[in-house]
Amino acid sequence: MKAAAKTQKPKRQEEHANFISWRFALLCGCILLALAFLLGRVAWLQVISPDMLVKEGDMRSLRVQQVSTSRGMITDRSGRPLAVSVPVKAIWADPKEVHDAGGISVGDRWKALANALNIPLDQLSARINANPKGRFIYLARQVNPDMADYIKKLKLPGIHLREESRRYYPSGEVTAHLIGFTNVDSQGIEGVEKSFDKWLTGQPGERIVRKDRYGRVIEDISSTDSQAAHNLTLSIDERLQALVYRELNNAVAFNKAESGSAVLVDVNTGEVLAMANSPSYNPNNLSGTPKEAMRNRTITDVFEPGSTVKPMVVMTALQRGVVRENSVLNTVPYRINGHEIKDVARYSELTLTGVLQKSSNVGVSKLALAMPSSALVDTYSRFGLGKATNLGLVGERSGLYPQKQRWSDIERATFSFGYGLMVTPLQLARVYATIGSYGIYRPLSITKVDPPVPSERVFPESIVRTVVHMMESVALPGGGGVKAAIKGYRIAIKTGTAKKVGPDGRYINKYIAYTAGVAPASQPRFALVVVINDPQAGKYYGGAVSAPVFGAIMGGVLRTMNIEPDALTTGDKNEFVINQGEGTGGRS
């Protein structure tokens, strides 16, 4: 028994040793397999496919920061600022960071932030907590630097500042309709700001950085420089723009009119020197401003031009040999197709100059009926009616122009005194700029241009010169536009009055008064159109309502630009003729 027990004991020890050896080998094998797996995984991540891990790491640490660029400045032709960008700050929150730091409390610092932003604390909390895991939300835009510095000093977790800019318009309402404005993201919304948005915007740069868990920049990876925005130099002269707006605004108020518009053009270059509307608005504070007030009426509103087209009728008649410069016309009222054609005052006969001076509907209608119906259509078109000016401003209309093949006699007659077509004030200004250049058509421009300017002769110079001289009589005693006369200067103008068309296409008992012309008449430099819409102060004729405004504006322009007086002297006294006096009472 004892011998058997002794033989079994070594056997058990041997089996136990074998078991331990087997377990050790298994453990070593598992360890080796684990090491092999880890080495394989490391090789996979580091050598074969490292991109995914790098991407995951970059997502947690890399940040792209925009390097903003300021919007370009808009200036007048002499470099005076009309629109500039001023530095401001945006206040934004990181909701996750705020939440991780304990959220919004009722402490003094959070109350101070709410007061600074003019937001009740409960509303501020609701906005930030609306998406607790979010990483970005604006709290305020375009905050002035002083307020932004105050908020920064509060050192609230998750509240950050971002640089941005805000547009400022030094001329305010004077240039509002022309310049327009931008939105909170500095995108052009109206006027030149919208039309030239790409030119003014530039291209922001980028900066890629690596941040640690606390948001601190620990490495600059790369950067792309921003492309500076372009500045824009307009054709506008800020001095003349202010003058035009002031006189127009006063006239609208004095005549209790619905609105008024005026356009001033350089005859020799086609540059728009001033473009104004009244009433206007403050582009620096748009709160409460109706959209209707933002409309640039000089390019959007159309009206029948009335008597302002009569110089072109006379030009066409002279060119076609229907009349001569010294012809005398029978201007006794007559009827066409049951409609009476008459003038404001009755004249038995008038010279060709008298037809323009007295604004005779009878005279110009007889000239029109003596020519083919296509004659006036062609002449009006040559001077730019029915065609967009392509000035580049958003919202411009090209007016309404007849395309009919057959015309009745009454349609031909009324077409000669400005009915049956519609134009914008800007289009009419282009017509008179062409008249002022003695028949040379030049494209209009809202940006400053350098001569030579593309041009095209559309009418014989001698005929246009003759008619311009005739137009001088309108502002002399006996003319319908005597109230436009300017001491010391000769001006060539035409006044007009037209009934407004209602929404149903019928004429209503409201009027538009306008005066268009060039000065100085001896060698025209400027063309000006003044439109007063629906005057309610008792007078509505162009000669009484818009002519005085024309005289005030053009007189100021000539003096501001140091144009030498050209009025004829009165003999030995060497005095300039004062083209003022009682005439037809401004009825034209």
Which residues fall in each region the model found?
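Periplasmic/cell-envelope proteins involved in peptidoglycan metabolism and beta-lactam response
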Residues: 1-286, 374-386, 395, 503-507, ...
